[in-house]
Amino acid sequence: MCLLRLPVTLLVLCVALNELKATSIASDTGHQVGKRKCNTATCATQRLTNFLVRSSHNLGAALLPTDVGSNTYGKRNAPQISDRELLHYLPL
């Protein structure tokens, strides 16, 4: 019976410490929303574009920076409707 007390005590202590850590982190952050992380390739492309735009000012070409990332607007894929699907909806 004594052999079971130590693992049970350690398990209870471990659960209590994990609960304590979880409550302290949750109370520190409050209701803040974290910024979404972007794709590595997207971030690298944006940094390279911004660097090239800044360096081009020294050469005389003034290009506008290109916004690339998850928060930018761009062309969206529209659903394609074929002619056969349109004919199905027409009354005969």
From Swiss-Prot:
Subcellular location: Secreted
GO MF assignments: hormone activity; identical protein binding; receptor ligand activity
Alphabetic keyword roster: Amidation, Amyloid, Cleavage on pair of basic residues, Disulfide bond, Hormone, Secreted, Signal
Residue ranges listed under propeptide: 23-34, 77-92
Modified residues (Tyrosine amide): 73
Annotated SMART domains: CALCITONIN (SM00113)
UniProt entry tagged with the keyword Signal: yes
Transcription regulation is among the record's keywords: no
Major location (coarse): secreted
Signal sequence residues: 1-22
Disulfide bonds: 38-43
Protein family (similarity comment): Belongs to the calcitonin family.
Record function comment: Amylin/IAPP is a glucoregulatory peptide hormone that plays an important role in the regulation of energy homeostasis. Selectively inhibits insulin-stimulated glucose utilization and glycogen deposition in muscle, while not affecting adipocyte glucose metabolism. IAPP function is mediated by the CALCR-RAMPs (AMYRs) receptor complexes. Amylin can also bind CALCR receptor in the absence of RAMPs, although it is more selective for AMYRs.
Description of how the protein assembles with itself and partners: Can form homodimers. Interacts with IDE and INS. Interaction with INS inhibits homodimerization and fibril formation.
Protein name (database record): Islet amyloid polypeptide
